[in-house]
Design a protein with these regions (language model features):
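Conserved beta-strand elements of the Class I
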Residues: 5, 31-32, 145
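Cytochrome P450 core scaffold surrounding the K-helix E-X-X-R motif
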Residues: 43-49
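Generic hydrophobic/aromatic pocket-lining and core-packing "Φ" positions
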Residues: 84, 157-158, 178
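Hydrophobic/small residue at the entry helix of a nucleotide-binding pocket
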Residues: 152-153
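Glycine-rich beta-strand-centered segment in the early N-terminal region that forms part
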Residues: 22-39, 51-93
């Protein structure tokens, strides 16, 4: 029987329970994934502590992960058992050995990318894609300012913006973070 982290009440890390859970079969449009890695994000803490309310209790935390497809539901044609996938922006359930997720939330993992990297990139990467392409399409010659340039989203955003040809100004809270930001795409860093 697979295991999962379950939360029955809001609180600190002590409210998380590691439990046996039934192996769920994927429904229409869903896939089941044998987890290789998960991303741990502040949003998981917000839900666990009750800062954001879960739509149901108990629940399994987690919004992104990566692994191998073990089963596909009706109508799923883009994946088959054995495919390596990463996924993000699911309602919850990633802190599990074999979660069932919407196939539409998954993407194939390219050769040369390991599951740990893929799992850690999904929510942060989707956030950056949204900001640098949909909110404002960054183009060569633009100058952008990125707050918290050495944070998880900031490190991806600064590299991506630099790749797009922008001049990147980042902010950081320490000399060490400023150096990290410079190593990851910032042309200039403001210490605060």
């Amino acid at each position: 029987m697979p295991k999962a982290i379950r939360v029955y009440e809001y609180g600190g890390p002590e409210v998380m329970r590691f439990e046996d859970v039934p192996l769920a079969e994927p429904g229409p449009g869903q896939i089941r994934v044998r987890q290789a890695a998960i991303g741990v994000n502040f949003i998981d803490i917000y839900f666990r502590t009750g800062a954001y309310k879960s739509p149901h209790m108990p629940y399994t935390p987690g919004k992104e992960g990566a692994g191998t497809v073990t089963a596909v539901g009706e109508g799923v044609t883009q994946f088959k058992a054995g495919d390596r996938v990463a996924y993000g922006s699911v309602a919850d359930g990633c802190y599990a050995e074999e979660p069932v997720i919407p196939a539409s939330a998954a993407v194939p993992i390219p050769d040369g990318v390991d599951e740990k990297t893929a799992a850690a990139m999904m929510l942060k990467g989707l956030t950056v894609e949204y900001l640098l392409h949909r909110t404002y399409a960054v183009k060569p010659g633009d100058t952008i300012l990125w707050q918290a340039a050495a944070g998880g989203v900031g490190l991806i955003a600064c590299q991506w913006a630099k790749h797009l040809g922008a001049t990147v100004i980042g902010t950081a809270g320490s000399p060490e973070k400023a150096e990290l930001a410079k190593q990851n795409g910032c042309d200039h860093v403001i210490l605060y």
